[in-house]
Amino acid sequence: MDSLQDTVALDHGGCCPALSRLVPRGFGTEMWTLFALSGPLFLFQVLTFMIYIVSTVFCGHLGKVELASVTLAVAFVNVCGVSVGVGLSSACDTLMSQSFGSPNKKHVGVILQRGALVLLLCCLPCWALFLNTQHILLLFRQDPDVSRLTQDYVMIFIPGLPVIFLYNLLAKYLQNQGWLKGQEEESPFQTPGLSILHPSHSHLSRASFHLFQKITWPQVLSGVVGNCVNGVANYALVSVLNLGVRGSAYANIISQFAQTVFLLLYIVLKKLHLETWAGWSSQCLQDWGPFFSLAVPSMLMICVEWWAYEIGSFLMGLLSVVDLSAQAVIYEVATVTYMIPLGLSIGVCVRVGMALGAADTVQAKRSAVSGVLSIVGISLVLGTLISILKNQLGHIFTNDEDVIALVSQVLPVYSVFHVFEAICCVYGGVLRGTGKQAFGAAVNAITYYIIGLPLGILLTFVVRMRIMGLWLGMLACVFLATAAFVAYTARLDWKLAAEEAKKHSGRQQQQRAESTATRPGPEKAVLSSVATGSSPGITLTTYSRSECHVDFFRTPEEAHALSAPTSRLSVKQLVIRRGAALGAASATLMVGLTVRILATRH
């Protein structure tokens, strides 16, 4: 590792001025850190994906209808459920990493609680769609037998959706604690784990690396547990008890519960939550507006791209079985290769967010540039490898020579597409770390749905380029998106991003409250401070009214660490607003249930 850093130092010595301007100082150390952080995250993503693959493999041996049903069910669950939860929970990438990088680490626990409540509410509209799976599929002219079995699978999967949401949220809770723990005395910001952020701290202690592994590897272990349970359950329910598609759905549910319970117990038993958890707090009901201002763009940023792939598969189904099969093969290749930039994207998001939370804009820029340069090299290698193996990859998935020939024609285009898509993915991590998801959502929406897909449809159906036309349109899309992300981040105001990170972590409001509370005189008529006699360490701060809250289950230090919400709502306001949110979500579910009943009768 020292040699890597020495190499970078030589580059900055003047032998290659152009390279020294491109490569940030400390690039070797930062690249190693990103790889160490994203490596387990890559394995975690692969293991999550494997649960659905195993279900498909078991049902594939039952027949074509069963295989089509499970494939369609997994796609429906992902598009109408999982993608929404993953997108909304991506707000935690910004909020948790920035809060953990700040001195106000207990705020991470509040964000976890807030995210759990929001995602549970979002389950209700998703369930409304799940209830009407068969009717939706028939509306799109899918096979009746396939639609019926797909409905069975999705109905069984309904209780598994909140479990998947919770599992994803717990994973983000760990991911965004970064290079963790135990080095308070080394950090210039009094922030555990941030000493590595500075070039002067060129090597990691074994203790810090061991503690870092405690944060990242539990996710991988939970994925291993989930896959083992899934394999055994599928064998028992599908192959032994002959429950068919229903058995596969039950196996999926069981595995989701198993890995979620394992991860939760691991966090509690290993006490990984102590630094960031101050107990249940009513503050999780506050500040939903800022949360949604990040969550909705995050969801759109992810779902826009995710849904574009599904639309592409649907369009290929309108052509022929050969085109659809070739698209399915390329989709599987794309999914596997995407896991690498996705893991690195999460690592970059964590590093950038923690650095901004610690007000270290130099390190934030270093992490962003290092991540982008790393993925450029990796994606070029992968793209070249895919092009070289274009005639062999198709044989892994099928024996049909027509499909294999078509796949080999399209893979060179996909290999170029992968390079730009991977760069976009890592830039997405930079945008999440800086809290700029809205720009990413706008770029993805424009490039995919105004440029990429329309161009792909034109080339596919009008120019008659078939599947090649679709991927050429997608290539134009990611090329333009990459150009937009490069231009935007080059002009990004990192100091302003650090100030916004201070707001996200709750430090700004806390500092204002503390500074104002110490002023004498008439200021107290606006903001009053009351210190309890029994616990002088607890300060109860109120804005323009004398409402206060004491949690006797917290220590004085923990209560002091929790920040005041940006705009505190009264109990009455909370009941009205959160009750309205619950009512709206419940009404959506009731509408879905009503539609199902009426459609079934007719």
Curated annotation (Swiss-Prot):
- Organism in which the protein naturally occurs: Homo sapiens (Human)
- Family the UniProt entry places it in: Belongs to the multi antimicrobial extrusion (MATE) (TC 2.A.66.1) family.
Entry's localization field: Cell membrane; Apical cell membrane
Indicate the principal place this protein occupies in or around the cell: membrane
Which pairs of Cys residues are joined through disulfide bonds in the record?
none
Q: Region Disordered: list its residue ranges.
A: 503-529
**Topology of the protein relative to the lipid bilayer:** Multi-pass membrane protein
Record GO terms (molecular function):
antiporter activity; organic cation transmembrane transporter activity; polyspecific organic cation:proton antiporter activity; transmembrane transporter activity; xenobiotic transmembrane transporter activity
Ranges per topology, Cytoplasmic: 1-33, 88-119, 175-219, 270-289, 349-368, 424-442, 488-578
What CDD domains does UniProt report for this protein, alphabetically? MATE_eukaryotic (cd13132)
Q: Which gene encodes it?
A: SLC47A2
One GO biological process from the UniProt record? organic cation transport
Q: Which key words are in the record?
A: Antiport, Cell membrane, Membrane, Transmembrane, Transmembrane helix, Transport
- What is the reaction catalyzed? thiamine(out) + H(+)(in) = thiamine(in) + H(+)(out); estrone 3-sulfate(in) + H(+)(out) = estrone 3-sulfate(out) + H(+)(in); creatinine(in) + H(+)(out) = creatinine(out) + H(+)(in)
Which Pfam families does the UniProt record give?
Answer: MatE
Indicate, by first and last residue, each region the UniProt record lists as having compositional bias (Polar residues).
507-518
- State what this protein does: Multidrug efflux pump that functions as a H(+)/organic cation antiporter. Mediates the efflux of cationic compounds, such as the model cations, tetraethylammonium (TEA) and 1-methyl-4-phenylpyridinium (MPP+), the platinum-based drug oxaliplatin or weak bases that are positively charged at physiological pH, cimetidine, the platinum-based drugs cisplatin and oxaliplatin or the antidiabetic drug metformin. Mediates the efflux of endogenous compounds such as, creatinine, thiamine and estrone-3-sulfate.
Q: What is this protein called?
A: Multidrug and toxin extrusion protein 2
Q: What is the effect of changing residue 247 to V?
A: Found in a patient with renal disease; uncertain significance; abolishes plasma membrane localization
Task: Tell me about pH and activity.
Answer: Optimum pH is 9.0. Active from pH 6 to 9.
Q: Which GO terms describe its cellular component?
A: apical plasma membrane; membrane; plasma membrane
Kindly report every residue range on the membrane side named Extracellular.
55-66, 141-153, 241-248, 310-327, 390-402, 464-466, 600-602
Q: Any stretches that span the bilayer, and where are they?
A: 34-54, 67-87, 120-140, 154-174, 220-240, 249-269, 290-309, 328-348, 369-389, 403-423, 443-463, 467-487, 579-599
